[in-house]
């Protein structure tokens, strides 16, 4: 029996580019060009924990354009084919990623964690993470949505195995 590693979403195809099958990709990585480290991408719209629903695609050419990637994928040769990819997620297999340093996490590792503060107030689950100029921000949904900065003064403990996060954050914010 083959064990299949789960996929980690690294970006999203946002639009076709030109008439020769190029697509615009919005990366969800710290560095815009990080996706260039992976010559084979998985494309799909489904659950990344079920990679059999995704299709493998090889990158023929790619370049950075502002905060987007312009990419020519093998087998996508005209604008109509490129348009059919719009909205698809770009992922790579988890075991292809380098291990994060101590105290660092992939965003995909943070999504789904249950967040509580030091007073044991349950804030809900991390449903998204986004970058700002200064730091990353967690989107936590429970009884309401909270934006919690992902900085050392606020995030006190992350337990990816236990799926929990302890924060020093006022429940009124």
Curated annotation (Swiss-Prot):
Protein name: Ribosome maturation factor RimM
GO CC annotations on file: cytoplasm; ribosome
Domain PRC barrel: 102-173
UniProt note: domains: The PRC barrel domain binds ribosomal protein uS19.
Gene: rimM
Membrane spanning residue stretches: none
Swiss-Prot/TrEMBL keywords: Chaperone, Cytoplasm, Ribosome biogenesis, rRNA processing
Intracellular or extracellular location(s): Cytoplasm
Segment forming the signal sequence: none
Organism: Methylobacillus flagellatus (strain ATCC 51484 / DSM 6875 / VKM B-1610 / KT)
The family this protein is said to belong to: Belongs to the RimM family.
Assembly description: Binds ribosomal protein uS19.
MF terms in GO: ribosome binding
GO terms under biological process: ribosomal small subunit biogenesis; rRNA processing
Chief location of this protein within or outside the cell: cytoplasm
Reported function: An accessory protein needed during the final step in the assembly of 30S ribosomal subunit, possibly for assembly of the head region. Essential for efficient processing of 16S rRNA. May be needed both before and after RbfA during the maturation of 16S rRNA. It has affinity for free ribosomal 30S subunits but not for 70S ribosomes.
């Amino acid at each position: 029996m083959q064990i299949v590693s789960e996929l980690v979403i690294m970006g999203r195809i946002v639009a076709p580019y030109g008439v020769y099958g190029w697509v615009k990709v919005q990366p969800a990585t710290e560095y815009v060009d990080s996706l260039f480290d992976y010559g084979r991408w998985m494309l799909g719209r489904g659950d990344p924990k079920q990679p059999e629903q995704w299709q493998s695609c090889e990158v023929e050419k790619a370049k950075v354009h502002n905060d987007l990637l312009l990419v020519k994928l093998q087998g996508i040769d005209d604008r109509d084919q490129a348009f059919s990819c719009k909205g698809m997620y770009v992922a790579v297999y988890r075991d292809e990623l380098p291990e994060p340093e101590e105290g660092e996490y992939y965003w995909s590792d943070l999504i789904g964690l249950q967040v509580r503060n030091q007073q044991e107030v349950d804030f809900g689950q991390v449903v998204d993470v986004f970058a700002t100029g200064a730091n990353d921000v967690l989107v936590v949904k429970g009884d309401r949505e909270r934006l919690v900065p992902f900085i050392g003064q606020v995030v006190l403990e992350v337990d990816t195995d236990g799926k929990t996060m302890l924060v020093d954050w006022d429940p009124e914010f």
